[in-house]
Amino acid sequence: VVWENDWPVVNPGAGMLTDTVEIELPEWRPETDVNSYTYRTGAKTCVPGSSREYDFTNMKVLGDEFLFLRNPEENMYQLTEKGLNLHFSPVTLKEKASPSYIAIRQQHHRCKVEACLKTDGLTSARRAGIAVVQSDEYQLRVEVGDSKADVILCEKGMDQCVGSAVVEDKEVVLSIAIDELKATVGMKDSKREIILAE
């Protein structure tokens, strides 16, 4: 901002507001700036504004951008050369307790979340998946268990199955694509890629 006669001039030279304004700021790369948190933590956290793509097989610790619900058990998860292993808990996302759940805060109105999931060992009582969670009463989940993937919309604490498909492989990629107030839930395996719900 430039000051003229004790008044701020936001767009000098144009004399009016425009749709865009060019601001001359030096480029900042937090991964190389010794004063930045990203640099000081040894790239434990993602660079601000960067794509959030994680390869858990190469991680020693979770970055600070990962969140947990309430007070999780210390041994709730493990990072190994095979990836991120969450230990099963009877607590669900609908309870005001500490489920086996690791999250990243949604930062944009348009985004896509994907997770590769091993399905062996999953049953109707031992389910795993991904979710967009607003609270214990409002969430969109895609869960795999008992050779089936279910898309569950929870509103006011009531679950409604809005899509499902048979799971044939021992490994699937689950996805939730958000576009403003709409969501598309998908699943892919070695043979197919399908939309489970929109």
What are these regions (language model features)?
Residues 6-198:
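Extracellular glycan-recognition regions
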Residues 1-4:
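Beta-propeller blade signature
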